[in-house]
A protein has these predicted regions:
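Catalytic alpha/beta core domains of metabolic enzymes, predominantly
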Residues: 94-97, 107-248
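Surface-exposed charge patches
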Residues: 63, 206, 254
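Structural alpha-beta junctions
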Residues: 34-41, 151-158, 215, 263, ...
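Active-site beta->alpha loop and helix N-cap motifs at the rims of alpha/beta catalytic domains
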Residues: 1-118, 295-306
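C-terminal extensions of enzymes
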Residues: 233-307
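Short, solvent-exposed polar/charged micro-motifs at secondary-structure junctions
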Residues: 57-60, 144, 171-172, 277
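A non-catalytic, amphipathic alpha-helix used as a structural packing/dimerization or gating element
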Residues: 25, 29, 223-234, 281-284
């Protein structure tokens, strides 16, 4: 089962500004498109909406998402560094009372903070938390999160999703094992919630299906690990790691523009543009990894999609 997350980072947080007013319209249009897709294909999509801000704002956004038929909210901790971990857990409880919650470990470079094992266990213990996205971009912190879930009595009720764009393939291949009450508990990331997956998506789906074949414990070929390094390389270019992610969203837009899916790279914030040299770096990864893009697939379907 696949899904779609909207009103999250790649959608641009500025949609929430009163003078922009696009939060509800974006959710509504996306809902309509997902309805159309499900009716045409008979498939079911998991519908995730982003929720941000203090508890009052996040609860209001959750109510909007619920009214539009979304399944869960991805609850961002961004901009809440002044809150204690206990206050963040209380916020999670409040939003989970509105609708199912996906917890979110956000990297510090994008407004997140270090969160403890105890915090993640408390989040996992929260009724209504159905999943957690780990985008710490840090292996130590990723283990804190997974260990917190492993030691929660609700561990079997929570799906783990990687948001670590710097470690996608390894995250999806790695079993995490912990001794809990005299027994070994194994957890894995079951999928990804990744801005990176908004581009070259057809290739992403094929890679994900291939990675799933190695969950039975068989030996992992070195070629897959090499491909993981390639994915990290071109992700770093799209997300503009060289400039501390300043051109992250324009980088995604540029890939979509080259494929004919967008008319330009504009963002709601006019100062958010491609960084110096980023377009050349996108040229480089296109040349280095032609087998990993999905340009041919997009070209084959573009006329129908844009009709």
């Amino acid at each position: 089962m696949g899904g779609l997350a909207v009103a999250v980072h790649t959608t641009q947080f500025e949609i929430r500004k009163p003078e922009v007013g696009l939060f509800e319209p974006v959710l509504r249009v996306t809902k309509e498109e997902m309805d159309t897709y499900e009716a045409r294909t008979g498939k079911t999509l998991v519908r995730v909406a982003g929720a941000c801000g203090e508890a009052e704002q996040a609860c209001a956004e959750a109510r909007t998402a619920k009214a539009l038929g979304f399944d869960a909210v991805l609850l961002s901790p961004g901009g809440l560094a002044h809150r204690t971990e206990e206050e963040l857990v209380e916020r999670t409880h409040a939003v989970a009372a509105e609708m199912p919650v996906i917890g979110f470990y956000l990297q510090t470079a994008c407004g997140g903070r270090r969160l403890s094992y105890e915090y993640w266990k408390a989040v996992a213990d929260t009724p209504g938390v159905v999943a957690i996205k780990c985008a710490s971009f840090n292996r130590y912190q990723s283990i804190d999160l997974v260990r917190g879930v492993a030691y929660s009595a609700r561990r079997e009720e929570i799906a783990l999703y990687t948001g670590n764009d710097d470690n996608i393939v390894a995250d999806l291949l790695t079993p995490y094992r912990f001794p809990v009450d005299g027994k070994e508990v194994e957890l894995r990331f079951v999928g990804g919630l990744l801005g990176h997956w908004s581009v070259w998506t057809h290739s992403v789906v094929k890679l994900y299906e291939e990675l799933r074949e190695y969950r039975d414990g068989r030996d992992i070929p070195a070629e897959l690990l090499a491909r993981g390094a390639a994915v990290t390389d071109f992700n770093g270019v799209f997300f503009d790691v060289a400039h501390n992610f300043a051109g992250c969203i324009p980088g995604v837009h540029e890939v979509l523009r080259r494929q004919g899916l967008m008319a330009g790279t504009w963002c709601l914030d006019p100062d958010e543009t491609l960084s110096e040299g980023q377009a050349r770096e996108i040229d480089r990864v296109y040349e280095m990894y032609p087998h990993l893009n999905d340009d041919a697939f997009v070209a084959l379907n573009l006329k129908d999609w844009m009709a």
